Every structure is written in C-alpha cells, then in structure tokens.
Amino acid sequence: MLTNTNLFFFLSLLLLSCFLQVSSNGDAEILSRVKKTRLFDPDGNLQDWVITGDNRSPCNWTGITCHIRKGSSLAVTTIDLSGYNISGGFPYGFCRIRTLINITLSQNNLNGTIDSAPLSLCSKLQNLILNQNNFSGKLPEFSPEFRKLRVLELESNLFTGEIPQSYGRLTALQVLNLNGNPLSGIVPAFLGYLTELTRLDLAYISFDPSPIPSTLGNLSNLTDLRLTHSNLVGEIPDSIMNLVLLENLDLAMNSLTGEIPESIGRLESVYQIELYDNRLSGKLPESIGNLTELRNFDVSQNNLTGELPEKIAALQLISFNLNDNFFTGGLPDVVALNPNLVEFKIFNNSFTGTLPRNLGKFSEISEFDVSTNRFSGELPPYLCYRRKLQKIITFSNQLSGEIPESYGDCHSLNYIRMADNKLSGEVPARFWELPLTRLELANNNQLQGSIPPSISKARHLSQLEISANNFSGVIPVKLCDLRDLRVIDLSRNSFLGSIPSCINKLKNLERVEMQENMLDGEIPSSVSSCTELTELNLSNNRLRGGIPPELGDLPVLNYLDLSNNQLTGEIPAELLRLKLNQFNVSDNKLYGKIPSGFQQDIFRPSFLGNPNLCAPNLDPIRPCRSKRETRYILPISILCIVALTGALVWLFIKTKPLFKRKPKRTNKITIFQRVGFTEEDIYPQLTEDNIIGSGGSGLVYRVKLKSGQTLAVKKLWGETGQKTESESVFRSEVETLGRVRHGNIVKLLMCCNGEEFRFLVYEFMENGSLGDVLHSEKEHRAVSPLDWTTRFSIAVGAAQGLSYLHHDSVPPIVHRDVKSNNILLDHEMKPRVADFGLAKPLKREDNDGVSDVSMSCVAGSYGYIAPEYGYTSKVNEKSDVYSFGVVLLELITGKRPNDSSFGENKDIVKFAMEAALCYPSPSAEDGAMNQDSLGNYRDLSKLVDPKMKLSTREYEEIEKVLDVALLCTSSFPINRPTMRKVVELLKEKKSLE
C-alpha cells in the first residue's frame, strides 16, 4: 500500500511525463511535415519519424536529441542526420522548432541554393554543419540576428561567388569551414575581425591570386589555420607568427615567395607546419628549433637552400620532409636520436657526407627516402631495428659497401629502390624472401650472387629490376610463382642457362629485359601466353634455335629485340601481326627471305649481320635469286630496260606541261607501320570530292587505294596565317602517335613533311566519331542508335586508351582535347582515341604520378574544358579525366555537352548532377507534395537517352556509371580519380551485374 509521500511522488512524475510529452508534440509535427515535404529518404533511415498514439514524442527518433529546457520541458535541441543518404533541398522547416540550436546534415545528397529569407528562421542556431553535400549558388547570407552562431561548416559543396561581407559580422563564430568549394574573389581581410575563431579552413578554394591578409594575425584564439591550395601569392605575413595558440599551420600548395619569417619561432604551440609546394627561398630559420611541440614538418617542393641546422634536426618530429629543395651539407647525427621519427623524406637535394649510422635505432621509422643526393659511405644498419620499416629509397647517391644482413630480417619492408649507387658484395639470402612489391638494385652497383629459389616467398612482387650488376647463376624456375610480376629486368649481368618455359604463368608481365647476359637454349614459345607484354629484349645472349612464331600472338608487343644471339631459321611471317615500334634481329644466323611486310627502309638495320637473309631492294641485304632465274637475268633485264625507257618517254610527254607549271616536290616521308602503299598513291586522292571533315588544323580526306584499303588522311593547312599552328599539330601528332601503340589509340601509319603541305595518314574508322553517332541528325546514317552494351564497351575502351597515355607511355601524355568527336569507331564499334594535335608530354615523378605542365593558353573544346583552366595555367592528366567524364555523360544522355535543353548557364555536368538526385521541389517551404511522384531515388528516365531501350539491369548499370562520370567531373582535380582507376571502376560496375 502506497504511503502519502510515495503517492505524491508518483503523481508528480506522471504529471511531469505528460507535460514533457505534450510540449514535444509540436516538434514532432514539424519534423514529420519537413520529412514529407522537403526530404527524400531512399534507405529508410527516418522510417521511425511517425506520429502514433503511443509514439508522439520525437525524442527517440533517429537523429534527434532532446534536452530538458527552462520550465522543465523536454524539447528538441539537435538534429544530426549526417551520412543518411538523404536528398532534397535545405530543410528550413526544422528551424520552426524554437529550441533547436544544432543542425548537422553532412555527407548526404542535399542540393539547391540556400536562400537568406527563409534561412532567417534559423537565427537561433549555434551550430550549422552541412559538409559534403551538393548545395550550390552563392554562399548563404546571415542577418545580424545570427549573433549566437558559433560553428559554420559548409565544406565540399558547390557554392560559388565571393565570401559575403555579412560573415564579418558573425562575431561569436569559433569555426568557419568553407573548404573545397569553387568560390572566387580573395581571402577577405574582414575575417581577421572574427576574434573568437579557433579554426579557419579555406583550403582547396580557387581564389583569385591574392596575398594572405595581415589581419589574420588578429585571430589570437586560432588553433587551426588551413589555406591549402588557395591560390595565395606574396610573402608569409609576419603577423601570422603572433598566433601563439596555433597548433596547425597549413599554407601548402600555393605560390608563396620570399623567406620563411624568423618569427616563426614564436609559434610555441604549433604541432604541424605544412609549407610544401610553394616558391619559398632562403635558409631554414634556426628559430624553428625552438618549436618543441612540433611533430609534422613539411617544407618540400620549394627553393630553400643552405644546410640543415642541427637544432632543427634535433626536434622530436614524426614526419620530416625536406625533399625537392636545394639543401647542401651533411645530415646532423642528432637526427638519428629522435624517438618519434616515422617518415623521413629528404630526396632531390644536394646533401653530402654519410648517413648517420644509428638512423632507425631509436624510432619506428616507416618510410626512408634519401634518393638523388650525394651521400656516400654505407647504408645505416639499424634502419629496421624496430621492425616497422616499409620503404627504403636510396637511389642516385654514391653509397657503397654491402647491403646490411639485418635488412634480410625486415619483414615489414615492401618497397626497395637502391639503384645508381656503388653497392657491392652478395645480397643477403633472406633479402630475396621479403614481402616486397618492388625491388630495384639496378645500374652502377656491383652486387653479386644468384637469385635463390626462395624468391618465390615474395608473392606480391611486381617489379624486379637488378640490371647492370654482377649477378650470376641460372634464372630460378620459382620466379614463375610470382604471379603479380609486371617488370623483370635482369639485363647486363652474367646469368646462365635457359629462360624458364614456365614464364607463361606470369600473365601480368609487361616488360622483360634480359639482354647482355650469357643465356642459352631456345626462346620459350610459351611466352606467347604473356598477353600484356609490351617489351621483350633478349639481345646479346647465346640463344639458339628459331624465333618462335607464337611471338606473333602477343597483342600489345611493340618492342622486340633478339639481336646478337645465335638464332637460326627463317623469320616467321607471324611476326607481321605485331605492331612493332622497335624490331631488331640483327647479328644472328637467320636465313631465307625476309617477310614482305618487313621489306621497308625503316626495318633495314633490323636484319644486318645475317648474311643468309635476302630481300629485294633492301641494300645491303642481298636479293633473293635461284639458279634457274640466273640464266634469264640478262635478256629479261634488257627487255625491262627497253620497256621502262619507253614508258618514261611516254610519261614525260604526257606530263610535260605539269613539270613546267610545278617544281618537283621534295618531301620527307616517315613510315610508322608496315604499309603497302606510297605517298604517290595518296596525292591524287586528295580532292574536294574525298573531303569528309575539316578542323582548325586542316582537312580530312577519305582515300581508297587500288588495293581496296581505305585510309584517313589529314592534310594540314599551309597558309601563312595557319602555318605555325599546323606545324605544332604536325609535330605533336608525330611525336605522340609515332611511338604510341595501343589497341584503343588510332594508328598513325605514315606522315609526309613537304614544302607545299604536310599530311598524316591514319587507319580509317568506318563508323566515324562517337560524336557523329550520338548527335548526328542525318537520317541516312548507316549506324543505328547505340544500345547501352555498345556504349559501355566504348566507354571502357576509350578509358583504356587514355589510361595508357597517362600511366604506361614514357613520358606520360596528356591529350588536352578529349571529346566525343575525337573518339573514333571502327567497323566493330571499337573505340580509338584520336587527334593528338594538342597533346603534351608530362614529366613522370618518382611516386608514379606526373607533374603539372604549364599551358600558354586554354586547350580543349567548349563543354569539355576542366574548371581549373579558369584559374591556373598548370594542368595535368586530371584535365583529361574531367573531359572523359563529360564523354561518359554524353553516352548516358545522348546530349551534347552544351545542349540548349539544359537551360541558360547550365551544361551537361550540372544537368546530370541535378537530374541524378531527382528530388521534389515544392514551391513553398512546407508545401504539399504528391508522394507518388517520388519514384526511385534516381529517376534515370529523365536522364538517359530515350533512344535506348533499357532493361532494369541496364538502368542499374547506368546508375553506377553515372557515379563514375560525376566523380570524373569533380570541380577539383584532386578529387578526380586517375584514368587507371576509372578503368577499374568501370570494369567493377560491369562485373557487379
């Protein structure tokens, strides 16, 4: 039986509970209405946002946090829907909840603009976090009523324009994060008056070139300043060094000049300094040595000089990066005493002296790169003392002595590059067994010993490069167990025995170099199973037997050198199937007639030193003659001379007027492939009737030879006003296509460089360009509308061609004019990337990336040009990735990049991004909406080309390819995948079906 006291307590709780429930009912109705009218929840994460008889309080709903407010009422204070995959516009209606102070909607697909008028409902907010969505338009303005706003995070959206002046009035603001938006203007000085700021992040914004405002030095509470990749110029203002609470200073990837201020030593709390990839000069200030809290220090890729001060070397750094500068002098021994050192990169400098012996003894060093310096002496024996070392890179120094035995016990090690040193002695036996992905000991070392069978334990090894040493013994059969091998370079050693026939197991091989050894036996025909092989060099050995005809089955082989061996037999005609850029079988014992396809001047040196080979008209190769033919040589020769003389006289009479009118042509002909025609077969066909296209650099002709073969001939403009451009196009096409061999890149067969004009001869693509097939309005076109299977195949093929240019060509090539009109289609609709008139070679970097190249003008075609052309002259292969993303969108939509149906100031990228989200847009904030109109998350029927008849499976596949296209067309190059990754993603999308 309850006592009076207990009864009173029970009734009080019951009354309070009822009051709390009633007070939150209004919040529940607001939330439910916003969900129905403004948000789309494809994954059903908000399915519990339902008002029922037993569940009228939202405090237990997903993403909702309630607190007891004044008056003992339970009310909604926080809405956090981050990562729930919701779409729609900004939910202004949330702000009708009077007690709401925090909104977090990060990592969703929300889009549209954020308008100032309805946003005023949210003036009581303290935290507004909208990172990683697709909001666009101008940054939202904030009225003076937003006096309590402390955190504003809008990172990784699509906001444009300048930072509004109203942001300077948000005096309570502690965090401002606008990272990764395509804003313009400059870093505004008024931000320096937001003195409560602790974090300011304006990284990865394409501001106009401008200096760092000195007013930022007023932000005395700032702990985190990020201005990475923000187009900053000028010197680092000394006022920044007044920020004594600063823990992170990131000014990397800009164009800052001048010296690092000596006053940097005042940043006594700083943990990380990132100044890499600028144009800073001078010496490192010794005052940096006073920063005892500093753990990450990166000043790489600048123009810094001088020696490394011992005081800085003594800092307890975790990451220490000085690479790509002009530092000189020795490396202080004290750097080895650092117990925190994990990453040490000082490559591409001019350091001298020896490496400190105790490096690695006191720290768990993981990555060690001292390459391209002038270090001498021995390798530090304790680098892997703590068993954490993963990468050791020491190439291009003068290091000597043996590889320490201790390295053989370093099972954490997976990447070794020690080429171009003076190392000697035997490689430790256990060294070969390490779980490496790359082992490079090549060039100018004097290492010796043999490759043990235990190398099979290095199961993930992809590159084995040990050329120019004193290695000997046989090539172990166990090498064939390394199924990930892409490169084998054993050249310029003393290996004996035969090439293992099990080489056919290495399906990923791309390059095999075994030249200048003492290998004997026969070339294994099984090598024909290595279908990725592009280069095979077995020259200067003692190989016997015949050339395997199976070599002709290697689909992408473009370099074959078998010279200086003891090979016998005839040259297999099957080799004519290869698309060879380099071919050499000279100095062997080959005999018989050279296959007709090789009987060209370009191949003449390839056959020298084989006295028993013969071919007509290929001096100094002897002509092929039989004994029976010899008796008839004289009379036949006389008859031929008489006939030829008569023909010449007749020809002279017929063409005499032409000779009077026109001087003799002097043309330089270069042949890049085996061809059965000459320039004289082409000249007469360059008529107006055969023109099939024209462009900025010249006319394109369709030329059909008497043999039935059809060619495409590009005749470049020769007029004075256009000669410079045509010369540039001619040179670019020849320098790129002349050495590129890939199944998805158009073949350049021949070029003619004459006084009157230049022309380039290509294989003819029967189905024209992808742009013609997709967009042609001619009703008589032979090509029917492309189905999705064909479009997808074209996308993958074109991606593979571009991937080859970016990642497998040496040097890498950026196309700069990727578009649907430059993707040609053969009779099987197989794509070929074409038109390399704007192509540029890039410099490959050590980390397998490529450097930027400066462009004097914007290159490319309207609708395909990457956004970064608008704010920088330095572009890299990521501009091609953007253009390819546009092509993917063309394949999906069937529309041109700037189709008028998109509306004013909108291109195919914006159209696809908006259409992909497919959310309802009610006219009023709380306006009603027909739920039947929602459909699926992505209503692709409004996006895809209506000419395609698609199955459900194909719709799903298109949605996945659309994701790849939108990734490729990201506003920031750093967010775009490489073309190699694009190929992987596309193939993954197909394999998922």
From Swiss-Prot:
SMART domains named in the record:
LRR_TYP, S_TKc
UniProt entry tagged with the keyword Nuclease: no
Residues that bear Phosphothreonine: 678, 872
- Provide Cytoplasmic-side residue ranges: 654-993
Q: Which residues are glycosylated?
A: 60, 85, 102, 111, 134, 218, 221, 290, 303, 348, 470, 537, 584
Choose one Gene Ontology CC annotation of this protein and give it: plasma membrane
Q: Which UniProt keywords apply?
A: ATP-binding, Cell membrane, Glycoprotein, Kinase, Leucine-rich repeat, Membrane, Nucleotide-binding, Phosphoprotein, Repeat, Serine/threonine-protein kinase, Signal, Transferase, Transmembrane, Transmembrane helix
Q: Give the family from UniProt.
A: Belongs to the protein kinase superfamily. Ser/Thr protein kinase family.
Q: Catalyzes what?
A: L-seryl-[protein] + ATP = O-phospho-L-seryl-[protein] + ADP + H(+); L-threonyl-[protein] + ATP = O-phospho-L-threonyl-[protein] + ADP + H(+)
Q: What is its main location?
A: membrane
Please state what is observed when this gene is inactivated. No visible phenotype; due to the redundancy with RLK5/HAE. Hae and hsl2 double mutants have a strong abscission defect.
Q: Where does ATP bind?
A: 692-700, 714
What tissue specificity does the UniProt entry give? Expression is restricted to the abscission zone.
Q: Kindly provide the name given to this protein in its UniProt entry.
A: LRR receptor-like serine/threonine-protein kinase HSL2
Tell me where in or outside the cell this protein is found: Cell membrane
User: Which regions face the Extracellular side of the membrane?
Assistant: 29-632
Instruction: Tell me its EC number(s), please.
Output: 2.7.11.1
**What is the originating organism of this protein?**
Arabidopsis thaliana
| Chain segments annotated as coiled-coil in the UniProt record | none
